Amino acid sequence: MLSLRPYEFWFVTGSQHLYGEEALKQVEEHSMMIVNELNQDSVFPFPLVFKSVVTTPEEIRRVCLEANASEQCAGVITWMHTFSPAKMWIGGLLELRKPLLHLHTQFNRDIPWDSIDMDFMNLNQSAHGDREYGFIGARMGVARKVVVGHWEDPEVRERLAKWMRTAVAFAESRNLKVARFGDNMREVAVTEGDKVGAQIQFGWSVNGYGIGDLVQYIRDVSEQKVNELLDEYEELYDIVPAGRQEGPVRESIREQARIELGLKAFLQDGNFTAFTTTFEDLHGMKQLPGLAVQRLMAEGYGFGGEGDWKTAALVRLMKVMADGKGTSFMEDYTYHLEPGNEMILGAHMLEVCPTIAATRPRIEVHPLSIGGKEDPARLVFDGGEGAAVNASLIDLGHRFRLIVNEVDAVKPEHDMPKLPVARILWKPRPSLRDSAEAWILAGGAHHTCFSFAVTTEQLQDFAEMAGIECVVINEHTSVSSFKNELKWNEVFWRGR
């Protein structure tokens, strides 16, 4: 996985001076105990840092400004141990630019029935202190995540951890650079979009580079580096027999290794974490990048085919949310319309990430009927099984829309010996008919990011952080209600 900045999350506890210094001391001790205990749990991908118990408007505003200024702080987690009058929070929340999570918990799990007294009641007031704080968030329209439950509950911790990954993806988004090799596939609509608007909305820098720039990097790769990478291929993957001996198949694999090394060097030199290619712009290259793209995706790079820079950026961000696991560029390719067993076969010309593989990938070389170049090497495998999501980001002109479909990936019932690409089979929720109808009504693209590891909740959280629309298609979706949701959303987003 591509390395990330050493991010951290700030834990800030709200209180007030009404209860005396002894109570505030206990609030601080409890807060530190919670943070220390949470940091011992390996579920958390980044450390929590206890900042302070804040009791005045000045303290609150100061910590929010400090969070904004910190490159390490990826988000702020707030909790009201006692009652904390929420007018004190207005100045700070007006300034805060980092993702905000409101943890509605309390230090003790159970009521101490035999010993509870008013001292206990005055100290442990989260039940109404967090409601006061929640009101000001609603009154101000603050984008925030609310997680409810005892801090020792594994489900609460899991939700916190996933939100952390999403907040880090949002932080990465603000500095994300996409390299476009060539332009979009000609005459295609959905892969187009407002790159200036995307930089304003998400922080993405999206720029194009001539194929000649990449070709020079490929030519500069040493044969020693190519041979070392070929040795790595032989350790990680099955290889067709012809690819293990000198000849045209071996040379095709060698060329993909050269492309991988050159492409990676270009991306590293420019600090790019996502990129696009297109089969219509390959002048000077021997092959369309296939195996090379698959392996770079497995390292955490975002990718989009046919110049699809929005999906490339989305794949990168979902890779961050997923910690690099089980996430790939994808395309709805063809349908299986057997009554009662409708499924979608997802694939692409070459570029499906091996992190979603159920079987050991196999390097194969086959002709590619488009692009007019030599036969490219690629990894071929069947995808895994389990609950997953497909996500698409589209540009509607006046706003971006994120569309999420929950799906269930299934094991293929039949072999596909003549299909020379990586593939995965899934059943969309609530059904192929209703999901496809809703997807088309929403304008969802044919390119998506498929993930076993990212959840709908994470994608909704990201949309909230980024200030964009998000619609979800799942087992509860009815097309008639979904159509109304799209109409209501149109009014809401045009009015913002």
Swiss-Prot record:
Lineage top rank: taxon: Bacteria
Binding-site residues, Mn(2+): E306, E331, H348, H447
Substitution effect: H348A: Loss of activity
Keyword check for Lipid biosynthesis: no
EC class (word): isomerase
Cofactor(s) the protein requires to work: Mn(2+)
Catalysed reactions, as listed in the record: beta-L-arabinopyranose = L-ribulose
EC number(s) on file: 5.3.1.4
Keywords carried by this UniProt record: Arabinose catabolism, Carbohydrate metabolism, Isomerase, Manganese, Metal-binding
Entry GO MF terms: L-arabinose isomerase activity; manganese ion binding
InterPro entries, sorted: Ara_Isoase_C, AraA_central, AraA_N, AraA_N_sf, Fuc/Ara_isomerase_C, Fucose_isomerase_N/cen_sf, Lara_isomerase
CDD domains assigned to the protein according to its UniProt record, in alphabetical order: L-arabinose_isomerase
Effect of E331A: Loss of activity
Cofactor note: Binds 1 Mn(2+) ion per subunit.
Pfam families on file: AraA_central, AraA_N, Arabinose_Iso_C
UniProt xrefs under HAMAP family: Arabinose_Isome
Described purpose of this protein according to its UniProt entry: Catalyzes the conversion of L-arabinose to L-ribulose. In vitro, converts D-galactose into D-tagatose.
Recorded family membership: Belongs to the arabinose isomerase family.
Name by which UniProt lists this protein: L-arabinose isomerase
Organism phylogeny: Bacteria, Bacillati, Bacillota, Bacilli, Bacillales
